[in-house]
Every structure is written in C-alpha cells, then in structure tokens.
A protein has these predicted regions:
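Structural register within alpha-helical repeat arrays
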Residues: 15, 55, 97, 138, ...
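Short coil/turn linking the two alpha-helices of tandem helical-hairpin repeats
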Residues: 20-23, 56, 60-72, 98-112, ...
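Contiguous, well-ordered beta-strand patches that form the walls/edges
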Residues: 473-482, 487, 493-571
C-alpha cells in the first residue's frame, strides 16, 4: 500500500530501503532506472520526479543507503537527478536538497515548483499517512535544524509552547527553557524516526541511534541497536554483537557477527574471524576453526571500506600469518599468500617484508625474482634491527637470507658461512615459536612450525673453521612448506573487478574466453600474475600486475603494466607505462 509514492514506485523503493538483500536492492534500482529511461524517451510516468529523487539518494553514496548494497557513488549523477526531481515537482526532493550541500543553487531556487514550506506540508501529510520515507524526511527537518526556515515546521515545533515574547523573557534569565525546547525538538525527530523505522525503513535506525548517543542515553541506544539488528541492518548487527561481547555473551555475539558477515559487513567479518581464530577472544567457549577464520578474514580484506570499516591491513595480515604458519595443517596455500601480499592495504606495513622475502626467494606462489628477494631481505633485516623481532615471521626472512648467501645472490659468490649463520638464527626462531605457550591465538599451546632451518643445516659440515657441503650435496633442501602438485602454473588471478562482479578471489588459471566474458560486463579488470612473470627489455621487468580499463568503446582500452625498473637501486619503484 502506498501513502505518498505511486504503487509502482513504492514497490521499487521498498526493494532498496525496506530490507538489506543486495540482489533485491539492485532489482529495485534497476526498476527505477528503467522508469528514468522511459521518461528520457518522452513517455509520461506518474510520479517521475520522486523516481529521480530516490535515485539521487542512491547515487549520493553508501551513507545515504546501506554500504553492503554496493551501489556506485556518482556525485554528478546524484546532483543532476536531484535537480531534475525538483524541476519535475517532487516535494521530497526539495527537502532532500536542503540536506545536500550545494544542491539548492540560485538557479534551482528560482525554478522551485513550490515553496520549501509547501514541500514540507506535502511530505508531512505523507508521513502522517504512514510513508516511511516521508517520516524519515520530516525527522531530518527537526534533527538537523531545517525547521528554523520552514513556518509549518516551526508551528509543529511550537505547538503547546508559550508565546515567543514569553519565551524571550524566560531566555533572559535561564538556559533551562532553551534546553527544554531543544529536547522537545529531538523528541519530535525521534518520534518520526521511530515511525519511519516501524514502517520499514531500515536506515532510520541509524539516525535514531545517533539521537540517543547525543543524549548519552545508553539504554535507549542499545534498544535501538537490537531493534535495528532484528530488522536486518548489518551495522546494527555488528553493534549488537559488540554489546554482547562486552557482556561476555560470546555465543550470542557470534550469532550477530555471523549474520552480518553473511551480508558482507567488514566489521562483522573481522569479529567473526577473530572468534574462530583466537579462542582467547571467547575465553575458549568458541572452538577454534581456522578454515572459517580464514574465510572471514579474506572476505573482510576485500569488503567495502567506506564509513564503517577501514581495518583491511589488519585482517589481510591475519590471513597471511594463519596461512603461512599452517596451524591446522590444511591452510597453507602459497598462491593465496602471494595474492594477499599484493593487497594495497598492506603496502606501507613493515610486517610484510619477511613474507615477501620468503615467497620471492623460494618461488612460493611467485616468480623466482632474486633481485626483489634481496631487496625484501634487506628491508626485513633493517626492520628487525629497528624493532627487535617480527614475532611469528623472523624465521622466514632468516631462511631467505641464508639461501641468498648460499647461492651467492648477495655476495656474487656463495658464502656458506653466512648462510649457516642465518639458518641457525632461523632454527632458533622456529624453536622459540614451538616452545612458547603464549601465542597470539590464545590457545595456551605451542605452535608446530616445520623446522625448515634444521633440514637445510643438514647439508653442511664444518671443515677447518669454515662450512662446506657434505659429500654428494650441492645445495641445501627441505621437505617443509611444499608447493602442492596441483598448483596452477602460468596462473593469473582476478584481483578485483568493480561494478558488482561476483568473481571474487581464485587461484585458478584464467583462459581468454573468461577474460572476454568479463570484459563484456566490466569497465575495469585487474590481474595479479603469480608466476611466469614476463619482462620487456630495457622497459619493465617482472610484470606482476596488468590493469585493463576502458570507457564505453570496448574495442579499445588502456593497459597498465606494473613491474620493476632495470636499476636494482630502483627495483621497488613501480613504473606505469601505457600501451
């Protein structure tokens, strides 16, 4: 039943704003986009101004919808649609424009089809009839102070108040009356937000919660949070879980986090991952499940990062550590580790150098790029000297350093004495990890890191004060941390594809038909190359990423190659030649 919009528009609006299912929300947006197209073709669509108003909100960014919907933010289209909505007679668009910085330009002000107060009256009537969006718009008028310039809103605010002259006299002697009136305005906003939420507008719970935060009313804030979580808003699911966690209700907290994780909320993904990875988070009431933890950490690493979640570096590193240490004996996927190490969120972290040194030195999910490996070993060594320890990754860079000395990559000639020194340091680091009970997972048990260092040390013997290979051995070897036989050679992985792609992360080889199929629907493709990295002599070496971008003409595109320059001193600088 519709109270303000036409039935057709109301149905589409409900799909976007009355629930938090991404597929249904996009279906509603597509229906409104189709009405806009018909309008542009000259067909008469009842209530078309309101269609433009709704889409203007959708294109204004995730803070105006719900972030997990994944709607594209387009300020140009948002302003254009809002202006069109106003010109086509949408009263609610006028109230929206009052809340949108720079939307009511002098030109638009002159073209208003009605006064702002008349727009308020129309929307207020819709709110009284039960329209969720009208109630939300009316609440905004009072919550954000727009009632000051709207006579009809002032009348609502002043209902039951003494005359302005009496209020003036009272104001000369006390601030209490002003505070009482401010509380009344907040109560009016809360009343309409409550009606909006109860009528189905899930995002109304966000604003309603804010009003209680500003009043420092923790009891009502928590009540709204649990109501919003029940209504299906992912942000409220996180907040509800956080409340339960603070109370020690860990099983209940996890239920909320998992519900939010199912809707791709980054904070819920992180919290659920923490529960499954680290028994200490729940006082060991939730059993450790490394596979679930990894799944949630890795999804959090690529979850939307606007407003609610910006912890991508942390969750990415947690996934890297878990996969590298292989705690459950089935998580070590070097292709995935190499992929995670390419994530932009961790580029500035010193903690990545031991992992990069190891994967480049031993070709773990990457090309055997020894120059890059040496650079990573050097950076890891400097950070080790600065900070003292990497905790769970010392052995990785020490093994890489030992191997680089063993094959003469650093000193031009093999230096087995230095190699053995670093292998011995690595053995000490591994032994330390395997004997501590206070690991960061909180299991109370030592880790079981494979002793690759001891296996490599078996290749050497001390002769006349220097190390040399034992008879019949030409290089150290290990059975630890093997690459699986099925690991795809010449593999390319789709790192990220914009515009609602469902490809996600994979460690499979992608053929040309797959790329062509994605190219038909996407504007932007970014590939990470795990091995078989190619070079263009005197231009770029070890190309590790290819980015393809096109505008509307799919027969032409820009291709960006990311790799390293020839000069070893510049090998950490990325070049961006366009072909």
């Amino acid at each position: 039943m519709s109270f303000y919009f036409t039935d057709q528009i109301q149905q589409s609006f409900n799909k976007i704003f009355h629930q938090c299912n991404k597929d249904i929300a996009w279906e509603g947006k597509a229906e409104l986009d189709a009405l806009v197209k018909l309008d542009e073709e000259g067909q008469k669509i009842p209530g078309i101004g309101d269609v433009y108003a709704i889409l203007a909100r959708v294109y204004s960014g995730p803070q105006f919808t719900w972030i997990e919907a994944g709607f594209p933010e387009d300020d140009t289209k948002a302003y254009s649609y809002l202006h069109t909505a106003i010109r086509k007679g949408s009263a609610i668009a006028i109230l929206q424009a009052m809340r949108t910085s720079g939307a009511l330009t002098p030109t638009i002000e002159k073209e208003l089809p009605m006064t702002k107060d008349q727009a308020f009256q129309r929307v207020y009537e819709g709110a009284q009839k039960g329209c969720s969006y009208c109630a939300y718009a009316i609440a905004n008028v009072f919550q954000w102070g727009d009632y000051h310039i709207l006579p009809s809103a002032q009348k609502v605010a002043n209902e039951g108040e003494p005359s302005s002259f009496v209020r003036f006299l009272k104001g000369l002697f006390a601030q209490a009356d002003q505070r009482r009136f401010a509380n009344k305005i907040t109560a009016i906003a809360q009343q309409w937000l409550r009606k909006s939420a109860e009528a189905g507008l899930v995002i109304a719970y966000r604003n309603l919660r804010i009003t209680y935060v500003e009043q420092d009313n923790r009891a009502m804030e928590e009540q709204v949070i649990f109501e919003g979580a029940k209504a299906g808003l992912p942000l409220m699911m996180y907040l509800a879980g956080d409340i339960c966690k603070s109370r020690g209700e860990h099983e209940r907290a996890l239920e909320y986090f998992e519900r939010g994780a199912a809707m791709n909320n980054g904070m819920c993904l992180r919290e659920a991952a923490e529960y499954y990875a680290k028994p200490c988070e729940s006082n060991k009431r939730i059993p450790q499940n490394i596979q679930k933890a990894l799944r949630y950490y890795e999804r959090a690493a690529i979850s939307p990062n606007y407003l609610d979640f910006n912890d991508h570096a942390y969750v990415t590193m947690q996934a890297i550590i878990l996969r590298t240490l292989n705690i459950d004996g089935q998580s070590q996927d070097w292709s995935r580790i190499a992929h995670l190490l390419q994530q932009p969120a961790i580029y500035t972290l010193d903690t990545i150098w031991p992992y990069l040194a190891y994967v480049f030195t031993f070709k773990k999910g990457n090309t055997h790029a020894i120059r890059t490996a040496i650079e990573c070993v050097n950076k890891a060594s400097k950070c080790f000297d600065r900070y003292g320890s990497y905790d769970y990754a010392d052995h990785l860079w020490q093994l890489a350093a030992g191997y680089c000395y063993e094959i003469g990559a650093i000193t031009k000639e093999p230096d087995l004495d230095q190699a053995v020194t670093f292998y011995e340091h690595a053995r000490e680091s591994i032994n330390r990890l395997n004997t501590r009970n206070d690991n960061w997972l909180g299991t109370g048990e030592p880790l079981a890191i494979p002793d690759e260092a001891s296996e490599r040390l078996e290749a050497f013997e001390l002769v006349d004060g220097h190390y040399q290979y034992k008879e019949g051995i030409t290089q150290s070897s290990t059975t630890c941390n093997p690459m699986p036989p099925a690991w795809p050679q010449n593999s390319v992985d789709v790192l990220e594809i914009f515009e609602d792609s469902t490809t996600g992360w994979r460690t499979n080889k992608y053929d040309w038909p797959f790329i062509e199929r994605e190219w038909d629907t996407q504007k932007y493709l970014s590939f990470i190359i795990y091995d078989n990295r190619q070079s263009i002599e005197n231009v770029i070496y070890d190309v590790y990423s290819i980015v393809m971008f096109h505008n509307e003409d799919k027969n032409t595109c820009n291709i960006y190659l990311y790799g390293y320059s020839e000069d070893p001193a510049e090998c950490d600088e990325t070049l961006e030649p366009t072909i």
